[in-house]
Amino acid sequence: MSIVLFLIVFILLSLIVSRYLYSVALNVPSKIDVVFNPIEKLIYRLIGTNLEHMSGKTYIKHFLLFNGLMGGLSFVLLLIQQWLFLNPNHNLNQSVSLAFNTMASFLTNTNLQHYAGETGLSYLTQMCVITFLMFTSAASGYAVCIAMLRRLTGMTDVIGNFYQDITRFIVRVLIPFALIISLFLISQGTPQTLKGNLVIETLSGVKQTIAYGPMASLESIKHLGTNGGGFLGANSSTPFENPTYWSNYAEALSMMLIPGSLVFLFGRMLKTKQQIHPHAIMIFVAMFVMFIGFLVTCLYFEFAGNPELHHLGIAGGNMEGKETRFGIGLSALFTTITTAFTTGTVNNMHDSLTPLGGMVPMVLMMLNAVFGGEGVGLMNMLIYVMLTVFICSLMIGKTPSYLGMKIEGKEMKLIALSFLVHPLLILVFSALAFIVPGASDALTNPQFHGVSQVLYEFTSSSANNGSGFEGLGDNTVFWNISTGIVMLLARYIPIVLQILIVSSLVNKKTYQQHTQDVPINNLFFSSVLIIFIILLSGLTFLPDLMLGPIGEQLLLHV
């Protein structure tokens, strides 16, 4: 019942926040302008932007330049952190390969971690690299999504100003929301301090080091921005990052909030601030139905437990790798949310999930469109929508058209490329891990689970998720460089292609009613969309899943 109430709250909050995002995205005057306008104007003066509207190419150019500059500065700081201030625990510099991986990870909103935060970063880099990139990567994803939505709902090549979009989103959404969440987490027991690690003497007389630091400020944006990287190595399974039952719900809800709201925002942009277009509701229904299906699957297999233990007379579900304070139910819920919304934070160890329970987060990342991350999740879903409309139109002999825009050969080539980037990166680099000498030494499990570890690592990297089957010994040159390359390519190539797609479509947009268009405003469309998503991704990844989690599940029942 608590999960049902939680999901109802998610839907209601998404509806409410989407109204606020409408004002932020479309520069609608509001009463709070008196607070935020002076801050924004100061930022515009500092960065030297004149707020001129940009064309699609200019928007993407500044998006890439901005991200490149942030990545370069972050890379340098990670290489010299031990010589800088705010390093009370005297943590050392990161190696070149690890610094590259960390930079690529947080720059792309992935937050894959091949280090433990307790020993791998200073407080300065935790705040000025990690937390900073958590804000800017989330805002960058939001900005390009809004640019795409403006194209789909408008009739002009002008899509706004990149710097204005990210500034308004950070100042008006991320910082205020993150501040509220941080204060709540502090009230629940999450530390926020610049003091060094605490050394205590236990009852047995042994000295123990307790790592803490500026955690609450990182935790809030970690979830709100669908980032996922933890201050500590064990992430949100630790009692500092996730102290209570209520903090667990707050963290889960905060990572769902903005991706869910963006779907309704799309509907409002298609219609009005007060009304949501039925097409956006049908997209939300498709996403939500798939989410519920995967959640139920994960719950079922985790509560079913391990048959090998049942043969020994040990009843019960799979509690391995889980916090007793959360149990199986909340752990499965968190697992499904963190991979559906491509956050990557964990409150249990995914490597300890049952084979098919662990396949749920893997498949969600392979789909990469069941809500997805900040902005890019909706962009990926819209590619599936266009594919569905195109195929359905051809099947019934109608001209492929989406929102009054004809989908022709040029657009379909770009749509196909955008769709293929994700599976190609996963499959090619997973194969390389078994071919390159020494790469497979990182595997800690033989047979099927070893394949699952490799597949999960590259799927998480390509989906910009960041969670992992952490039995993999991944802090090596091969794994640092390969996953870093995957994260960068999987982030930027699809975004560029998707903006090119809508830039091409917008030139064909008309407000005339087209009776020959495929209906996209009913539950039948949602059903067909779900079927196409499952079929397209299933045909792509099923052979690899057979060699991984499905094979492992069959092995348990031999």
UniProtKB/Swiss-Prot annotation:
Assembly: The system is composed of three essential subunits: KdpA, KdpB and KdpC.
Localization (cell): Cell membrane
PANTHER family linked to this entry: POTASSIUM-TRANSPORTING ATPASE A CHAIN, POTASSIUM-TRANSPORTING ATPASE POTASSIUM-BINDING SUBUNIT
Record-level Gene Ontology MF annotations: P-type potassium transmembrane transporter activity; potassium ion binding
Keywords for this protein: Cell membrane, Ion transport, Membrane, Potassium, Potassium transport, Transmembrane, Transmembrane helix, Transport
Name listed for the protein in its UniProt record: Potassium-transporting ATPase potassium-binding subunit
InterPro entries noted in UniProt: KdpA
Main location: membrane
The keyword Magnesium belongs to this UniProt entry's keyword annotation: no
Organism of derivation: Staphylococcus haemolyticus (strain JCSC1435)
GO cellular component, one term: plasma membrane
HAMAP family linked: KdpA (MF_00275)
Described purpose of this protein according to its UniProt entry: Part of the high-affinity ATP-driven potassium transport (or Kdp) system, which catalyzes the hydrolysis of ATP coupled with the electrogenic transport of potassium into the cytoplasm. This subunit binds the extracellular potassium ions and delivers the ions to the membrane domain of KdpB through an intramembrane tunnel.
Transmembrane segments: 1-21, 60-80, 129-149, 169-189, 246-266, 281-301, 326-346, 353-373, 376-396, 415-435, 485-505, 523-543
Listed Pfam families: KdpA (PF03814)
Domain of life: Bacteria
Membrane topology: Multi-pass membrane protein
